[in-house]
């Protein structure tokens, strides 16, 4: 007999050490919480598939290592490990795979997800139930039988045959118990006279109630009122008990007065339909063994044993306290136990089968029984939910919840089986994941679920057979499940027929027809997949999708076929089932002389098979007596031997009276050890179990003549009867051959169906459009600024390159002409001639015009202090030979004013150079030069004809002669004359400073430099520095009034002041003087310009009042897009920039800036809502017209210009249930985080195709076609957090991060040499200009120090600008980088150590593997001859702060570095922690240690530290598993100890 496990079993040293720690007060809770947090952290982080494969592989290895040692702690660890893997899968499913494009896809995908959530819930509940089976052992009864209680044995019956019931009754009468203390009652709801007669004959009590109300429960309740025993023992009428039943079970009931129920297993000595009908079923454990062998024993640990309706003892007082057996549901047994436990009663389970019964003979009966169970458990779930109400512990609630919700499996099972059909038939991909991702996440989840269940179930249930059981019943239970949940009162009790015979085998179509239909549909889906894979033209993505779903469909089909195969009923002619038994017997004559001795092989109520050697040839049936001794009692049974030979004899009983029948029952069923081998099956081997399931499918295709006629189960038993591969070496070969045949058959059927599936439509994978929008860069120009290189539409807004506030070209007004004539009278006499090619003006290349894009143009500006006196346009290019001079032309206009017309010459397609004079009066500050292509005749053209085109060469020239206008020195004109916003080119602003370069004066200059940076924005600004006023041109002079150059005449100032004075050496130039009586006033004066809240005065002099500046907050720069709410496009650009005209309107751009240190949980995309309007009517081709959306030259998505709702939408619109599509469309779009950095640009390209091609159309149709983005379109960055891994010079190159985190640079200090030269100061000012352009805010908070005073700003980020002559002073600031500057060279001084490399390789094995052949690059380069270096590292003064050093031996090198920051094309090459610039060449390096800046909410730290780090995920996850297992094992042991403490004490006394 198994003993109760003690909590003080031998443990390993590690376990003992952990036990000592856990014994400390509060340690267990602390360790448990820490372990749970670690486990949650590890499950919350998703990894790329290739990294997840590492986690999966290691977890599989650990599974085999731990699973090799069978122990309770190992099982708990495997369950927790399985939970870790499954929760990682669940996290991945919820966060990475739920991307649906259609409502049908969303519906199907959601259904699959809900089914998976149900499966995971059941998995975890099963782990909870079985985490610590109690293994309860029998307790001895009091030694004096007089102290034993009285027992009433109930045998309820309704319509069963007497031949079945009499076995149970006679077996009950033979139970070893004092006769005066036990009474057997036949509860006959059929009220049959033969049963009453039998009761009188055998000595049982017969009870028949007048009505059949409440079926079995009512029958039992009626009997309770007519009996008075202390306990009630219930047997179903086919369950024959062993004689030791009460002696082995009553000890617990007597010992513990709180136990209301003692349940024992339901063992069936006949095979169930799965064992009998499937070819591999005979070696498979019965379906019910899992529940009685594992689940109930686990329930007992939680004091949640269920009453199963039979083979159980109940305490009468407990039953009477709840008002009798429950009658509200059709499963009175489970509901009765629940009611008793709600009142505080305990239940117990003894895992020793003490009765044997009949399994359902036919599949349809089996299904009917399960339908009743499902209905009853779901009724309890609805009307008496265990999660609610009083009296239950959480352990009991969860165990009951598991039992009830397990019968909800039908709908999820159907969903799992049919899910691949969503893609194979409808092209709906309901899991948005690659096959590699599924392999990395789903397969490990299934492996651990199956493997851990195999370790738990051992030989009680084989892997994959639950799928067959569920599939067999699922389609029958779907309706029952739904109806019962909606209406729990429906349904009635049905009695399961037992003991039937089958004269011949047949196929029970009624039991499997739903699965046949499902199987045919699945086969069609599989055939479709095979056909597409074989003959379809698929891209790689579609091919993988078909392969994955076809494999899924194949697995589903195998399970369905196995379920169908159960319907192949085999014949059953025997009235009595054979029961294997090994009992010594003697065969004697009538006179008592022994003929032969032997050992029985099997027994039944019809006879016995005995191993023996019959001494003589058997001439016919011979009467004999079989004698044996059972438990000290001799049994002599009359029989006849009917066959003998081969060491075996077959006997049949010759029963003449009730006593002889009683003796046979005692021999066959009543032995105390009759069923001890009930669970003696081989341990589960999942792969072999899968092969058995496949082999069972083969039986479905056998002919009627091949049906195996088995009269009884040949169950694998201990000893010689056990089926063993070592005894049957050909078994594996047979399994393999059967598998090969099955696969071949399926392949043949699939191939045969491919011809029929050939005409089926193929799902075509969506592709990105071949044409993707491209963002136009705006290169700086030497004199005039081009505003666009795309299509410039007359009278419309800029198509993509105009910045905010830039004016559009307008026809020249009369008052403008008068003003120009008036100004011309005072102009200088010096004229300047400018020659610009179209490329110089901003054309990306030659300008080509076609019918769909007939209007192309260029925007440029004229400085406001210049007057155009003459101009000429010199053109060259080519025109299509198909053009005709009488109908086709190219017309040039400037600001809507006619310049000239080009006519084609078919004989000479090329033309030019051709010169066109331009009236200088046409020019304004902002100008638009347009080229308009006419491709038709008489107002009609074929705009879609690609053979009609005209091209203007990019080398065509615009020659402009200008003279300077007299200066107008008004502060209100600032930033003119230094920068004219109409002239969009790189700006140069000379700065005049005293040679001492006082830090306060430098700060004032830096404020002004950043203000100019804001004005020039992305154009860039350079500040050449000198100590003297230039001989010509404009300049800014900053200094204390008393220190200003005497050439200015010492202007009188009474405080902070700003003045515009003429350049003493150039009357047409202006000097902007920023001054004050002291250095503080100079700073105030510079702030007066930079922070002016109102327009500056229309005067040349301004006294500045002190300026109050509010402290800045992180990431609040005016240039940065708001991140706490969705931002409208209309707040980023003017509405005109969002509009386009014509079928091809060019690229509409929406630029914005954002801090680059953005981080989202799991790299969740940002949200963008695109709203756009397209004209109604039939002008465009709906199927081909689209809007392409991109960001930073990365394609995101395309949308049709006219929203369509498909067939369903058309039908709904037709009946008036849906509104027709409107011109406004609204689409939500995901923006991947990796596409966003500091300077960003959204690109929108409308590509509208005309409805009719090749047909003459109105020439005005194209220009009348208007498309545009709605200004209420939004982009939302509110889900982003700020954190970044440094060093990363790319952040600096885009928006000056991390220094611009505070827009005024209040957390930044600039480190300059003690005596900087002009080049160093110029580099400083250029850098401040760059910062101002990045933030649109003056750098009023920056501090300037020398290297000797950096300790005063230790808590700030440091910007170091130095030449090699002073490099020694700043060397300590770079101590945390891997570089040093010495002897004019920049060198690498340190690499990671071997230990660091090893740690890095373990932390990120994939990267280490990819970089295994690469070596760190050593840097050794001279910083002379214009070579500059930019180094970024963590500050040695304060952790988390950054040092950025700009180093060179000369000003040219520093200037080169600063110019590099302003060139967008070069920004992409600025990366890592070191950039070396040499002319146009850039080299980036990454060697220095990394560090992190920024903060995250606590819940985001796991994702930040473990994303892309599989080893970290493993370490944290396994640590959590170990800690949780340690705490769980101790807690479970203590719980078991509490459960048994009093009884163990009692046993020790005995």
UniProtKB/Swiss-Prot annotation:
Substrate binds at residues 236, 238. CDD domains: CESA_CelA_like (cd06421). The chain crosses the membrane at residues 26-46, 47-67, 106-126, 398-418, 423-443, 468-488, 507-527, 547-567, 1513-1533. Residues 147-240 are annotated as: Catalytic subdomain A. SUPFAM superfamilies: Nucleotide-diphospho-sugar transferases (SSF53448), PilZ domain-like (SSF141371). Pathway: Glycan metabolism; bacterial cellulose biosynthesis. Residues 768-796 have a biased composition (Low complexity). Its EC number is 2.4.1.12. There are two conserved domains in the globular part of the catalytic subunit: the N-terminal domain (domain A) contains the conserved DXD motif and is possibly involved in catalysis and substrate binding. The C-terminal domain (domain B) contains the QXXRW motif and is present only in processive glycosyl transferases. It could be involved in the processivity function of the enzyme, possibly required for holding the growing glycan chain in the active site. It comes from Komagataeibacter xylinus. Bifunctional protein comprised of a catalytic subunit and a regulatory subunit. The catalytic subunit of cellulose synthase polymerizes uridine 5'-diphosphate glucose to cellulose in a processive way. The thick cellulosic mats generated by this enzyme probably provide a specialized protective environment to the bacterium. The regulatory subunit binds bis-(3'-5') cyclic diguanylic acid (c-di-GMP). This is Cellulose synthase 1. Residues 711-734, 768-813 are annotated as: Disordered. InterPro entries: Cell_synth_A, Cell_synth_B, Cell_synthase_bac, Glyco_trans_2-like, Glycosyltr_2/OpgH_subfam, Nucleotide-diphossugar_trans, PilZ_domain. Induction: Cellulose is produced at a linear rate with respect to cell growth when O(2) is present. The gene is acsAB. Its cofactor is Mg(2+). GO terms for cellular component: plasma membrane. The active site is at 189, 333. It catalyses: [(1->4)-beta-D-glucosyl](n) + UDP-alpha-D-glucose = [(1->4)-beta-D-glucosyl](n+1) + UDP + H(+). It is found in: Cell inner membrane.
């Amino acid at each position: 007999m198994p003993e109760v496990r003690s909590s003080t079993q031998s443990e390993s040293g590690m376990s003992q050490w952990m036990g000592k720690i856990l014994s400390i007060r509060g340690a267990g809770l602390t360790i448990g919480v820490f372990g749970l947090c670690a486990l949650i952290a590890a499950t919350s982080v998703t990894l790329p598939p290739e990294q997840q494969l590492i986690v999966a592989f290691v977890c599989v290895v650990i599974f085999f290592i731990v699973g090799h040692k069978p122990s309770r702690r190992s099982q708990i660890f495997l369950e927790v490990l399985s939970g870790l893997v499954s929760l990682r899968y669940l996290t991945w499913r919820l966060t990475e795979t739920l991307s649906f494009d259609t409502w049908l896809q969303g519906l199907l995908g959601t259904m699959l997800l809900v089914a998976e959530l149900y499966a995971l819930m059941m998995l975890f509940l099963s782990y909870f139930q079985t985490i610590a089976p109690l293994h309860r052992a029998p307790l001895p009864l009091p030694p004096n039988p007089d102290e034993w209680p009285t027992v009433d044995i109930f045998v309820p019956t309704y319509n069963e045959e007497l031949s079945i019931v009499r076995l149970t009754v006679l077996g009950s009468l033979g139970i070893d118990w004092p006769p005066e203390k036990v009474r057997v009652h036949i509860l006959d709801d059929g009220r049959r006279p033969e049963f009453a007669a039998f009761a009188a004959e055998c000595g049982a009590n017969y009870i028949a109630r007048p009505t059949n109300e409440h079926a079995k429960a009512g029958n039992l309740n009626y009997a309770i009122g007519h009996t008075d025993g202390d306990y009630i023992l219930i047997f179903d009428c086919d369950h024959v008990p062993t004689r030791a039943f009460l002696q082995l079970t009553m000890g617990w009931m007597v010992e513990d007065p709180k136990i209301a129920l003692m349940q024992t297993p339901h063992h069936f000595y006949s095979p169930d339909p799965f064992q009998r009908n499937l070819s591999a079923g005979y070696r498979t454990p019965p379906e019910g063994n899992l529940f009685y062998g594992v689940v109930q024993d686990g329930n007992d640990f939680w004091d949640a044993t269920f009453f199963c309706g039979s083979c159980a003892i109940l305490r009468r007082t407990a039953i009477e306290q709840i008002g009798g057996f429950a009658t509200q549901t059709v499963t009175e047994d489970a509901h009765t136990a629940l009611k008793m436990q709600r009142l505080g009663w305990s239940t117990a389970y003894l895992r020793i089968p003490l009765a044997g019964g009949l399994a359902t003979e036919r599949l349809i009966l089996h299904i009917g029984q399960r339908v009743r169970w499902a209905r009853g458990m779901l009724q309890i779930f609805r009307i008496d939910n265990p999660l609610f109400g009083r009296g239950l512990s959480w352990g009991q609630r969860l165990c009951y919840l598991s039992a009830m919700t397990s019968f909800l499996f039908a709908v999820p099972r159907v969903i799992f089986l049919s899910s691949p059909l969503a893609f194979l038939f409808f092209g709906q991909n309901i899991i948005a994941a690659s096959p590699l991702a599924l392999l990395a996440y789903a397969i490990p989840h299934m492996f651990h679920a199956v493997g851990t269940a195999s370790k738990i179930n051992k030989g009680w249930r084989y892997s994959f057979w639950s799928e067959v059981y569920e599939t067999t019943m699922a389609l029958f239970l779907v309706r029952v499940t739904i109806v019962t949940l909606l209406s729990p009162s429906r349904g009635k009790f049905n009695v399961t027929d037992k003991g039937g015979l089958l004269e011949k085998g047949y196929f029970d179509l009624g039991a499997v027809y739903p699965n046949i239909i499902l199987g045919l549909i699945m086969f069609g889906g599989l055939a479709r997949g095979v056909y597409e894979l074989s003959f379809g033209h698929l891209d790689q993505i579609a091919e993988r999708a078909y392969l994955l779903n076809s494999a899924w469909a194949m697995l589903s089909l195998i399970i369905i076929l196995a379920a169908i195969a159960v319907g192949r009923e085999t014949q059953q002619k025997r009235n009595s089932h054979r029961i294997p038994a090994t009992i010594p017997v003697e065969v004697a004559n009538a006179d008592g002389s022994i003929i032969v001795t032997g050992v029985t092989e099997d027994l039944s109520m019809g006879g016995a098979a005995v191993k023996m050697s019959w001494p003589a040839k058997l001439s016919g049936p011979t009467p004999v007596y079989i004698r044996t001794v059972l438990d000290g009692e001799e049994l002599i049974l009359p029989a006849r031997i009917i066959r003998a030979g081969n060491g075996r004899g077959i006997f049949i009983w010759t029963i003449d009276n009730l006593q002889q029948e009683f003796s046979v029952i005692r021999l066959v069923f009543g032995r105390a050890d009759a069923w001890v081998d009930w669970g003696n099956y081989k341990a589960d081997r999942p792969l072999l179990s899968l092969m058995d399931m496949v082999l069972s499918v083969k039986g479905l295709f056998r002919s009627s003549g091949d049906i195996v006629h088995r009269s009884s189960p040949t169950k694998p038993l201990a000893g010689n009867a056990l089926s063993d591969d070592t005894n049957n070496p050909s078994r594996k070969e047979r399994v393999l051959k059967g598998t090969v045949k099955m696969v071949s058959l399926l392949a043949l059927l699939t191939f045969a169906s491919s011809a029929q599936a050939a005409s089926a439509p193929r799902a075509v994978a969506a592709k990105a459009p071949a044409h993707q929008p491209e963002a136009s860069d705006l290169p700086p120009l030497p004199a005039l600024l081009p505003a666009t290189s795309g299509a410039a539409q007359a009278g419309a807004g800029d198509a993509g390159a105009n910045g905010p506030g830039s004016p559009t070209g307008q026809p020249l007004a009369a008052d403008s002409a008068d003003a120009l004539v008036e100004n011309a009278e005072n102009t200088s006499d010096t004229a300047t001639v400018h020659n610009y090619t179209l490329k110089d003006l901003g054309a990306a290349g030659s300008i080509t015009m076609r019918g769909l894009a007939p209007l192309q143009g260029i925007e440029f500006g004229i400085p406001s202090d210049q007057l155009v006196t003459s101009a000429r346009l010199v053109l060259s290019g080519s025109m299509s030979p198909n053009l005709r001079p009488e109908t086709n032309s190219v017309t040039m206009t400037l600001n809507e004013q006619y310049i000239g017309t080009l006519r084609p010459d078919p004989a000479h397609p090329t033309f030019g150079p051709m010169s066109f004079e331009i009236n200088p009066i046409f020019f304004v500050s902002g100008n638009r030069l347009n080229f308009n292509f006419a491709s038709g005749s008489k107002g009609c053209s074929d705009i879609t004809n690609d053979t009609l085109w005209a091209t203007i060469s990019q080398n065509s020239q615009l020659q402009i002669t200008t003279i300077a206008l007299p200066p107008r020195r008004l502060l209100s004109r600032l930033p003119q004359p230094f920068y004219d916003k109409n002239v969009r080119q790189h700006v140069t602003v000379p700065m005049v400073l005293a040679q001492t370069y006082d830090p306060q004066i430098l700060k004032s200059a830096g404020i002004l430099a950043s203000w100019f940076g804001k004005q020039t924005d992305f154009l860039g600004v350079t500040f050449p520095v000198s100590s003297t006023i230039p001989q010509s041109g404009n300049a800014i002079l900053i200094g204390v009034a008393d220190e200003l150059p005497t050439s200015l005449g010492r202007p009188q100032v009474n405080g902070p002041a700003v003045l515009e004075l003429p350049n003493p050496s150039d009357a047409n130039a202006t000097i902007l003087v920023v001054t004050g009586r002291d250095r503080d006033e100079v700073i105030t004066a510079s702030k007066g310009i930079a922070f002016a809240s109102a327009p500056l005065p229309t005067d040349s002099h301004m006294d500045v009042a002190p300026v109050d500046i509010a402290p800045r907050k992180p990431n609040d720069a005016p240039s940065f897009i708001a991140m706490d709410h969705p931002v409208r496009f209309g707040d980023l650009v003017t509405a005109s920039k969002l509009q386009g005209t014509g079928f091809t309107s060019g690229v509409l751009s929406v630029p914005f800036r954002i801090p680059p240190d953005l981080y989202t949980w799991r790299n969740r995309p940002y949200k963008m809502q695109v709203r756009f309007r397209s004209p109604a009517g039939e002008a465009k081709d709906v199927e081909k017209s689209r809007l392409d959306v991109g960001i930073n030259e990365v394609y995101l998505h395309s949308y049709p210009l006219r929203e369509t709702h498909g067939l369903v939408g058309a039908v709904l619109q037709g009946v008036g249930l849906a509104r027709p599509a409107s011109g406004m469309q609204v689409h939500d779009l995901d923006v991947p985080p990796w596409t966003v950095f500091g300077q960003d640009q959204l690109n929108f390209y409308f590509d509208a195709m005309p409805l009719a091609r090749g047909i003459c159309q109105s020439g005005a149709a194209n220009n009348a076609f208007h498309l545009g983005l709605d200004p209420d379109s939004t982009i939302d960055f509110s889900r982003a957090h700020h954190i970044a891994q440094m060093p990363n010079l790319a952040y600096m190159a885009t928006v000056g991060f991390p220094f611009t985190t505070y827009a005024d640079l209040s957390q930044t200090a600039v480190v300059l040499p003690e005596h900087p030269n002009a080049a160093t100061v110029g580099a400083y000012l250029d850098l401040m200009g760059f910062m101002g352009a990045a933030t649109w805010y003056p750098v009023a908070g920056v501090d300037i120090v020398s290297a000797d005073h950096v300790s005063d700003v230790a808590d700030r980020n440091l910007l170091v600008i130095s030449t090699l002559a002073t490099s020694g002073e700043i060397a300590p600031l770079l101590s945390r980088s891997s570089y040093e500057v010495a002897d004019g060279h920049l060198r690498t001084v340190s690499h990671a150590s071997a230990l660091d490399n090893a740690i890095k390789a373990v932390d990120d094995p994939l990267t280490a593997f990819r970089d295994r052949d690469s070596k760190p690059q050593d840097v050794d380069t001279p910083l002379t001859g214009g070579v500059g270096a930019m180094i970024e590292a963590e500050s040695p003064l304060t952790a988390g702060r950054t040092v950025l050093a700009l180093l060179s031996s000369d000003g040219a090198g520093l200037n080169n570095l600063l110019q590099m920051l302003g060139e967008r094309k070069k920004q992409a090459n600025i990366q890592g922690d070191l950039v070396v610039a040499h002319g146009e060449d850039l080299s980036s390096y990454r060697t220095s240690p990394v560090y992190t800046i920024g903060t995250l909410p606590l819940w985001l730290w796991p994702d930040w530290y473990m994303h892309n780090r599989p080893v970290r995920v493993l370490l944290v996850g396994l640590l959590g598993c170990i800690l949780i297992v340690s705490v769980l094992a101790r807690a479970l042991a203590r719980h078991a100890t509490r459960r048994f403490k009093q009884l163990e004490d009692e046993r020790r006394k005995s």
